[in-house]
Amino acid sequence: MVKKVVMATIACAASGIGFVPAVHAQSSVTLWGLLDAGVSYISNTGGHSAWRLDDGIALPNLLGFRGTEDLGGDTRAVFQLVTQFSLQGNLVAQTSNGSGTGTGLFARNAWVGLDNTQYGKLTLGRQYDFMVDTLFSDVGADMAMYGGGFYGFRDGPFAKLGIPDSPPNEAFDFDRMNGDTPLNNSVKYTSPLLGGFRFGGMYAFGGSAGNFQQNSAQSFGASYSLGSFAFGAAYTDVRYASLLGDSIRNYGLGAKYRGDKLLLTALFTSTRNTQNGAVVNAAEAGALYQFTPTISASLAYTYMWGNGAVDRNHAHQFGSVAKYNLSKRTAVYVQSEYQLTNAGANAAINGTFGPSTGRSQFIGRVGMQTVF
């Protein structure tokens, strides 16, 4: 039941594959989308509490086009174009391996390639790395996937981690699993499923004059599934121009158990800035239970800790979501997130875009989501 009600609805947020019926044709183009909106209360952002109508939290607001063409010999031409937007009518900026952010029409994903049943898939363009593809989409090891969403990804009192293009005073989505940081100019290979095993690798060209490696990136991932269990590992290294030859390195390990009504997840990620030596680790455990076909609830706990370069700050974060499915495509939900840091550090839940002036920060939210 968990697989039917939760996985089919939420997994598309990172993978970019919409919740639509399969199209059995030699050539097809599918339009799909995700929408989320709600009201959130933030206990402390910049010293003040706040109420706000925000969107793209439990799911990002996405509109995508997916196309396939049968070329014969078990080979297909494939493409995907995805844009992210707010319900206020604005495109959402996406960071990348280049300097600054992108607000182009298809800044979330834009790629084309070939997919062969026997040999795998080769794609070129602006794409997710394997922190997203393997740990989030393939294994499903991140509880943010099942309801925590934007507020459930990792952030905290780690501004000294120094990730380029991150919002001021934050280490926004430092382990890259939110999907907001696709890689430009990338070539990616993903193997077919081989006895439960899948692997892949990608390289993103920098292309800066006089410095081939500047703004380049590389990523690798592997996963294995066996019955109700799935496991995965991923690594991504991005050489941002502003780091002057150094990089942000991420790696992660994840696991998931999926039963009839119970789903359990475990995730570990580590992020290093090779320029200043800063390291932040995160360990998360989560559980979701499907009480009825329409009612589910999830809990998540995350512990994040840094080394001396980030003042050895650490943070505990607790998240919960209760969801009621109005249909197979539409749901309403209640969400809470609470973060508590060590003394002298300011809490910063991902997506608040303004840390607390104290050790704690709380978010309560009521929202609605739909997919098409």
Provide a role label for each language-model segment:
Residues L326, R359-F372:
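Outer-membrane beta-barrel "beta-signal"
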Residues Q213, A217-N325, Q335-Y338:
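Detector for outer-membrane/organellar transmembrane beta-barrel domains
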Residues F19-A25:
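Sec/Tat signal peptide C-region and signal peptidase I cleavage site
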Residues I42-G46, Q88-V92, D133-F136, G210-Q213, ...:
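Outer-membrane beta-barrel proteins
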Residues H48-W51, S96-G98, F174, G206-G207, ...:
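Extracellular loop and loop/strand-boundary signature of outer-membrane beta-barrel proteins
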Residues Q26-Y41, W51-G206, S223-G227:
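Outer membrane beta-barrel
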Residues V29-A37, G73, A77-L81, L122, ...:
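Transmembrane beta-strands of outer-membrane beta-barrel proteins
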Residues L62-G64, N109-W111, S186-K188, S219, ...:
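Membrane-embedded beta-strand positions in outer-membrane beta-barrel channels/transporters
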